[in-house]
Regions:
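Short, well-ordered beta-strand segments in beta-rich or mixed alpha/beta enzyme
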Residues: 3-9, 42-73
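Short amphipathic alpha-helical segments
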Residues: 15-41, 77-80
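Alpha-helix boundary/capping residues
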Residues: 25, 73-74, 85
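Glycine-rich beta-strand-turn "strand-cap" elements at beta-sheet edges
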Residues: 40-50, 81-100
Length: 100
């Protein structure tokens, strides 16, 4: 099992709206691609500052090929949508992990 993790720092002023949008719109679109079998979202409890909060959005896949296909063919357009909606109010980094 592979875990594609996206850690996102989001402006606290829009945290609730962003989280709802992720759960209601963004993540369902990703899951409909069939590239992932499950997802989870966690709030990061350490290293917080006064202006932002971080979340770990985790997508689980059975094969590296599906993750690569998602990253190369699907994610760029989704990133554009996220960037358009939240502009300079977020930062993100991605990590791919393999269960051992």
């Amino acid at each position: 099992m592979l875990l594609y993790n996206i850690t996102i720092g989001i402006d606290k002023e829009i945290e609730a709206e962003w989280l709802q949008w992720m759960k209601d719109q963004y993540i369902p679109v990703i899951m409909q691609t069939g590239m992932f079998v499950d997802w989870k979202i966690y709030k990061v409890l350490h290293d917080q500052d006064d202006s932002s909060v971080s979340y770990s959005v985790q997508y689980f896949s059975e094969t590296i090929e599906k993750v690569v296909q998602f990253v190369e063919q699907i994610e760029p357009e989704l990133n554009k949508q996220h960037q358009k909606k939240y502009k300079d109010r977020h930062v993100a980094f991605r990590t791919l992990l393999e269960e051992v």
